[in-house]
Amino acid sequence: MSRGLGDVYKRQVGMFSEHTQTKTAPVTTSSPAAEESQPYVFYYKDGQAVNWEDVTDAWAAEAGIQKRYALTDAERLEIAQVLTAEAGGEPFAGKIAVAQCILQTCEDEGIRPDEVLRVYAYSKRRPEPTQEALEAVQDVFDFGIVATTEPVKYFYAPALTDSEWHESQIYVMTINGHRFFKEATE
């Protein structure tokens, strides 16, 4: 079940018809038998299959919404990979919060995501991104969805490390195993 904002609008826009087919789904399942029974939803408009990326762009344009922060395909993939590495075991809200930290730093520092990921010492691992990580990137960077209205920029996992520096910043919230902070001003 997808949790991205786009799926909410897929069903609310009302200009697309939905066709559910029980065939092999392009998702990882536990067995070939489970794969065969997995429903796969196709969306159509005027008899043509709809590319969801085009739908979100069209919906946003029609609604007068601009993407909050335009990403290249390579940046989108790399951020999703980092979310998978940094917050793969966290709930969706945790992935949103980590993506929000990256976005906030991009906007505050005026730098691109690749520089944020390098300078701010995000994980150097780049695993295959999960669907949730891809959706979190879309929700945060395209639609401006955030986990908090506070401008969080930093986080760490206390179970994995101690960080006096993080704790010297302004604590905002904890989501599962991560503590999130906004920048302390002097």
Regions found by a protein language model. Name each.
Residues F42-E186:
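Bacterial extracytoplasmic/cell-wall-associated proteins, especially those involved in peptidoglycan
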Residues M1-Q12:
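Single conserved hydrophobic/aromatic residue that forms the stacking wall/gate
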Residues S2, S17, S30-S31, S37, ...:
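Generic serine detector
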Residues K10-Q66:
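Membrane-proximal envelope biogenesis segments
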